[in-house]
A protein has these predicted regions:
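Acidic, metal-coordinating catalytic segment for phosphate/diphosphate chemistry
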Residues: 1-35, 39-41
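Conserved hydrophobic "DFG−1" position in protein kinase catalytic cores
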Residues: 7, 38, 47, 111-112, ...
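A short, polar/proline- and glycine-enriched secondary-structure boundary/capping micro-motif
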Residues: 26-28, 56-61, 132
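A glycine-rich, hydrophobic loop/mini-helix early in the fold
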Residues: 33-64
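Unchanged
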Residues: 66-148
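Charged phosphate-binding loop/patch that engages nucleotide di/tri-phosphates or the phosphate backbone
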Residues: 148-170
Length: 170
């Protein structure tokens, strides 16, 4: 199934045009990707392992993905979280952490407090194949040993102070 994404300009305005996922972006075109750090209130974050056949296969990541055409950032976050983990959350439950931009993507970062047994997580076949809770220490070790996807490792480093400011370890 083809996936279409809204095209944004450099100021993050929707252009009214759409982009077919997997095709190159033109200069000055941007997509929107959302990421969430699900935390349990006890200093642990939910991580999933990327399935075989995906880029960065076998590495761990937080939940996220591209917003589809017509979706808001929060709508995309709720959809991605449900698709990849089976966790349902209202858009209003996501706490906004901040945004970033690279050469063709705007990123929105969120956190979500949710205590849930790993047995209740429903992984999306072909996307992820394992799940765990990991604290700051374990995440730092996983970054050093390259067990976390390098893109996610970079995001975590940029978001860590904001996550700690929000006292997500309690």
């Amino acid at each position: 199934m083809q996936e279409w994404n809204d095209i944004y300009d450099e100021y993050r305005n929707r252009t009214g045009r759409v982009h077919l996922r997997g095709t190159p972006w033109k200069p000055g075109e941007y997509g929107l990707t959302v990421c969430v750090w699900v935390y349990d209130g006890s200093g642990h974050f939910l991580l999933t392992r990327r399935a075989k056949g995906k880029s960065f296969q076998g590495t761990w990541e937080n939940t996220g993905g591209a917003a589809q055409a017509g979706e808001t950032s929060r709508q995309a976050m709720a959809r991605e979280l449900f698709e990849e983990t089976g966790i349902r959350a209202e858009e209003s439950e996501f706490e906004f952490l901040g945004s970033d931009r690279d050469k063709c993507t705007f990123y929105d970062f969120y956190c979500l407090k949710r205590r849930i047994s790993l047995k209740r997580i429903v992984l999306l076949p072909g996307e992820t194949d394992a799940v765990m809770w990991a604290g700051y220490g374990k995440i730092h070790w996983m970054i050093r040993t390259k067990k976390i996807c390098r893109i996610i490792a970079s995001q975590f480093r940029r978001q860590e102070s904001e996550l700690k400011k929000r006292n997500l370890s309690k």
